[in-house]
Amino acid sequence: LPISLLLNESAPSAQRVKFIFPARDNMPKVAMPEVEVHWYDGGLMPERPAGLPAGKNLNVSGGAAIFYGTKDTLICGCYGKDPYLVSGRVPEAPKVLREITESHQMDWVRACKEDADDRVLSASDFSEAGPFNEMVVMGVLAVRLQGLNQVLEWDGPNMRFTNIPDDAMIKTVIKDGFHIKDGHPTFDKTWTDPVNAQQFAQELIKHTYRDGWALPAMPR
């Protein structure tokens, strides 16, 4: 199968991943319909939102996030820095959330040091950061499984893909082998041996680690 070159021991040089989250129960004042999230990295860029001024750089403080709403489009930098609306409108939004005036690392340290009975959770505690990290690495899994040529359905509670066929096989390019032969571009890829796709995916999800190192006896 025509698979782009993937590196077995590191992340892809660039990737684009599309996540589709099903509709959720509505919140008191906010509807929660199905939503799509598009992830770009490695220099790949999304389309510029309609109405964004010419010359305006989307990359703000190391990255950007674009939120398409029914009334406007919001753009912010990495970690939500410097948000603005494409229309130029500046809304008078009530401040109902605790503002983090220090780094998120120190906010986490503060929460660790506080008494458990009256602790104020950090702005990105494990209950939030864990599922977020799961989403990101699930996209990396999808890139490594692209040879299946299918949309993958994820079962979060059971940490597995539900629609990979039992007999599906997958292989990965380990050497590109591109060269010019007699003036013509030639592609001579080297592939891994085919492996069962379900087992391959499960090993990536729950890796089998080797035994740890043992330190020699220390002198007293």
Regions found by a protein language model. Name each.
Residues 2-126, 130-169, 173-220:
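Glycine-rich, aromatic-lined ligand/substrate-binding cores of catalytic
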